[in-house]
Regions:
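A short acidic, often aromatic-flanked loop/helix-cap motif at beta-alpha or helix-coil junctions
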Residues: 46, 88-90, 140-143
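Short, well-structured N-terminal submotif of metal-dependent ribonuclease cores
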Residues: 1-41, 54-70, 141-143
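Residues that scaffold the ATP/ADP-binding catalytic core of kinase and kinase-like folds
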Residues: 16-17, 51, 91-95, 130, ...
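Active-site neighborhoods of divalent-metal-dependent phosphate/nucleic-acid chemistry enzymes
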Residues: 2-3, 50-56, 64, 75-120
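Alpha-helix capping/helix-boundary segments
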Residues: 13, 44, 88, 107-108, ...
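Acidic, PIN/NYN-like endoribonuclease modules and their adjacent C-terminal/linker elements
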Residues: 1-3, 109, 114-143
Length: 143
């Protein structure tokens, strides 16, 4: 039986797809992946919603466009959005006690470990010493 690799996408992967000059390797990774192998965290949705709210202050029309895109992500990933469960929170607590780390990135990494996913991110420096399978598509298209 073949085990299918599954991926947890960091918020920076999602945001990259909105850029006018998005990194080709990121787009290639996403287009070459089976959609059902890609997962999101509720934390990424929260970060994106925060961005929408902040953008509303300076550019309401752009904010509405981004909000529509975020709503589309939520719909498209509906059965592949992971919450922060007890095991992920406990692992995050252990890792955070080792040294200061960004909360959301470390929670995402813990979620990836608990659910046996490869964490796809550009922010590898804060988690490189952790037992997390990581893929940085800015550097390489596949693990």
């Amino acid at each position: 039986m073949t085990t299918r690799i599954r991926y947890l996408l960091d918020t920076n992967i999602l945001s990259e797809t909105r850029k006018k000059r998005a990194e080709e390797r990121v787009l290639a990774f996403l287009s070459n992946s089976t959609p059902t192998s890609l997962y999101l965290s509720c934390l990424s949705l929260g970060e994106l919603k925060k961005g929408v709210a902040l953008k509303m202050k300076s550019d309401p029309s752009a904010s509405k466009a981004i909000a529509g895109w975020v709503d589309g992500l939520e719909t498209n990933f509906a059965d592949r959005i992971l919450g922060v469960d007890t095991e992920s929170a406990k692992l995050w607590g252990e890792w955070s006690a080792q040294r200061p780390r960004p909360v959301v990135d470390t929670l995402l990494a813990a979620t990836a470990v608990v659910h046996d996913l490869v964490f796809v991110t550009r922010n590898v420096s804060d988690i490189q010493d952790l037992p997390v399978k990581v893929l940085n598509p800015w550097l390489n298209a596949r693990e």
